[in-house]
Amino acid sequence: ALWNSKSSSIFGFQLLGRYDSFGNFTRAITPNGTPSPHLPWVPSEQEIFDAITDKRLDEDSLALIPDGMTARTFAAKVARDRLRSAVPNVDDFCDAEVNDSMYFTLFPNFHPWGAFNRINYRFRPVGKKVDECVMECIYTEDFEGDERPPPAEYIELGLDQEWTELIPLIGNLGRVFQQDSFNLPKVQKGLESFQADGLTLTKYQELKIRHWHSMAERFIAN
């Protein structure tokens, strides 16, 4: 498949996200299907939907947006149709709850996604090592009937393995996880070689990191 660099740059996740802190947890909300205000052109609703679905240049669109409907509204309709069997009252929820990325950080190590997203992250220590941890990605799934199926298989990746090896099992999430974690070794090396007395964090977009360190210092002090 041929990558479409134009469609991949439509969204301005860093610009449009909202970050909040509440006691011992933080929340981030990223609106999906909303183009960046800094684009030098105005994308069509079809271009927006194709970007949402990661359409490549040599692929057909997964669906054609009906006239008069926005890509965001259409994506919400598709999501509701998918959820209806498990959530009969899904029409009572707004588009943001079925469309957008809402992710929480519950101090110190649990990161559930909100609304109808099925992803959860958990970080656990590896003995007393300060530069290593276990990152767990937990994907919850609906099941039919009253009997709960057996637990899913626990799959463990080695330090030198890539998330993309799991694409046959978890689909496009393998690419997402790989994209989000491939630079972690470089970040770790940068932190270890950093010569300043403390980190410089942005006031807003790195609110989650600032809040975590604030909570850690509070617990250590007490």
Model-assigned labels for residue ranges:
Residues 1-222:
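C-terminal catalytic domain of Rieske-type non-heme iron oxygenases
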